[in-house]
Curated annotation (Swiss-Prot):
Gene: glgA
Reactions catalysed, as given in the entry: [(1->4)-alpha-D-glucosyl](n) + ADP-alpha-D-glucose = [(1->4)-alpha-D-glucosyl](n+1) + ADP + H(+)
Disulfide bonds: none
UniProt protein name: Glycogen synthase
Record key words, sorted: Glycogen biosynthesis, Glycosyltransferase, Transferase
UniProt pathway annotation: Glycan biosynthesis; glycogen biosynthesis
Cellular component GO terms, alphabetical: cytosol
Signal peptide limits: none
UniProt organism field: Halorhodospira halophila (strain DSM 244 / SL1)
Amino acid sequence: MRVLFATAEAWPLAKTGGLGDVAFGLTRALAELDCDVRLLMPAYPGTVEQLEGEVRRHTAELAGEGVTLIEGRLPGTGVGVWLLDDPPLFARVGGPYATAGGDAWPDNHWRFLRLSQVAAALAAGDLLDWRAEVLHGNDWQTALAPVFLRDRADRPATVFGIHNLAYRGLFPAELYPRLGLPAELWQPEGLEFYGQLAFIKGSLVFADTLVTVSPTYAREIQTPAFGWGLDGLLHHRRDRLFGIVNGIDTATWDPGSDRHLVAQYTGPDDRARAANRRAVARAVGLSEGEGPILGFVGRLVEQKGVDLILAALPRLLAAGAQLALLGAGDHRLETALRAAAEQHPGQVGVVIGYDEALAHQIEAGSDLFLMPSRFEPCGLNQLYSLRYGTPPVVYPTGGLADTVVDVDAHPQSGNGFHLAASDGAALAAAVERALAHWQDRPTWHAIQARGMAGTYSWAASAQAYQDLYRQVVASRG
């Protein structure tokens, strides 16, 4: 199976969020299944230098303009990479989507229109001596690719990955006539979205198959609460909408060999947990006691339920718990967390920013992991927590609902704890339930063991994607 995986980012070349991790983990796992997967992304500053293998430059022509592709290998994998080398669009100081100051690049419509054009042409065999059977686009930055292929009988099958529907690629209507897109598609059944241009509709309407990052999220985005105004369209396409849970890098996230831990372990181990708890306490400024540590690692934004942690804080501390939090984000929430740490020295430890080693230590040294996200398409931290024997406390949405089983609802298979509602009181109640089990060590060890025994690698996810590719190719005859 020949697959072109088109993305705006891929770790370690460039990464701003979960899409970068997926692009690396999924393509590597597909290659290990003997899938001929190639990755296309822009050549941002510093990306070419990271390519492995023989690096070659290809030139071609598309719509009267030159196209330059730099070929190499994705570091640490057998995945071929083509970098779209277009310096006026992509060789600039800042991030893939925004300036160093955080403002969206004013020409993002041109930048990712071009990426979509090149993805379509490359997949169709118009640029190089290679053509894809499947074009797998990801998020709004590559979503226009199926538009450029829609009238071609010889086109590849098209699959579109929705990683977070909140990002729809919205642009002012007055840009539409300048982009060379078909005039007849400026309508609600095409690319128009309440008076704006929505790049993401290029794939939501025209891709053969849609896939998102968990079965529950695939259902949720068909509802007004999670659909961002696109729920009607997604419900209309529900027979071609699937959900596959992301995997994690189980070599990097392995408590048995994790170099960031002071004590490694392969199963429930109170002595190793105690050593790792002491390391976390020292790192974030907690007093070293016997009480449970509640961990949090993530963006400090309301989507992640950080305000719920603050609301639940009095009850959590009254239950004898300590909190270890690592993250950055909303200035208001950062300020509130710093104030909580000052008000409760030794009980609340906060590190603003991101530290990879500390993230691993919090997963291994906490007794519970808090993840009360209001919505979470898939989520990774709950998978890290399960693998590290740190039962997660989650609001059951998206991938959290698909991967975390409530202990009290399912005593024989439970591996974590669900909030009954998305509020601070429900979070406190869920933690109190969890701590009642934590006091019973044999029961707690069984909960930990079930989480650690789960399958979280990319191998199973990649097999599901390969099966989906075969289905969509077969459905096109």
